Amino acid sequence: MTPSLQDAKITFLGGGNMAAAIIGGLLAKNINKQNIYVSEPWEVNRNKMADLGVRTTTDNKEAAADADVVILAVKPQVAKGVCEELSSAWSSRSSLPVVISIAAGITLASIAQWFKGDSGKAPPIVRVMPNTPALVGEGASGLYAAQDVTDAEKELTSALLGSVSKATEWVDK
């Protein structure tokens, strides 16, 4: 069952500017800080996230182990490795989290293939294109979902992105 935004365990893989903006929006909506986990390799960014009161680590597998939502907020050149790393870590999970990619220029098909790995199973994936006004809570986001994303997962994604966007729009291509 898909949890509500208030109850969801949300993991950010990457702690850059857009992740920080979304986290700020979530905290402004009184989301429990302990439900937000950020995996970030750079100490400076990790410390900024810790200053917000959320949990931090350098270990993607640890951060995403029991997540309901994983936000792929990494640089495009490292996305494949991150997805493949999690694919092996999630092989024993009975249900997979919804993955929301804000990584620029990476297709759903690529993300799905990277997650499938040896298991042949990809999580439900949503691709989001937030714009820079999201950095100050005034954004607009275009969202595109893979076919296996449920209505409840779409609602959760809309609520999450609504924390930094004045408008969210689902598109079909």
Task: Show where each model-derived region lies.
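NAD(P)+-binding Rossmann beta1-loop-alpha1 motif at the extreme N-terminus of oxidoreductases
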Residues: 1-66, 138
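Predominant activation on well-ordered alpha-helical scaffold segments within soluble catalytic domains
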Residues: 23-24, 80, 112, 158
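Short loop/edge segments at beta-strand edges and connector loops
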Residues: 40, 58, 126-130, 171-172
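Rossmann-like NAD(P)(H) cofactor-binding subdomain of soluble oxidoreductases
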Residues: 52, 60-65, 69-72, 76-143
